[in-house]
Design a protein with these regions (language model features):
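Negatively charged, low-complexity tracts enriched in Asp/Glu with abundant Ser/Thr
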Residues: 1-19
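A short, structured beta-strand/loop element
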Residues: 15-59
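Generic intrinsically disordered, low-complexity segments enriched for polar/acidic and small residues
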Residues: 2, 13, 29, 56, ...
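Acidic, low-complexity intrinsically disordered segments
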Residues: 56-90
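Sequence-level detector for tyrosine residue identity
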Residues: 3-5, 51, 58, 81
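Ser/Thr- (and often Asn-) enriched beta-sheet segments in non-cytosolic proteins
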Residues: 5-7, 45-47, 88
Length: 90
């Protein structure tokens, strides 16, 4: 399950998974998704804390670089919200 974290001005939606526990190692997957003018979506997923890209469809290298910088500034918050099941908004 993924929980919405934020929507950027360019309509990119960033969402995160719950905490995944693999042999005592905690990780979070972060999904980036944006509508394409041709139809469908640009989509990419990155695993934290390794910053390993799991897949990427249609995002440019510049986009991925921006997302990596975003993740570097938000990883601690994404882990925090992942541990409590997403941001609680009414």
């Amino acid at each position: 399950m993924f929980y919405q974290y934020v929507e950027l001005a360019d309509k990119t939606i960033i969402a995160h998974s719950e905490i995944k526990n693999n042999n005592g190692n905690k990780s979070v997957e972060v999904q980036f998704e944006r509508p394409r003018s041709e139809g469908g979506f640009c989509s990419a997923r990155c695993e934290l804390p390794s910053y390993k890209w799991i897949f990427n469809e249609y995002f440019t290298d510049d986009n991925l670089h921006f997302f990596e910088q975003f993740l570097e500034h938000n990883a601690h918050t994404l882990f925090k919200y992942a541990e409590c099941g997403g941001i609680k908004i009414a």
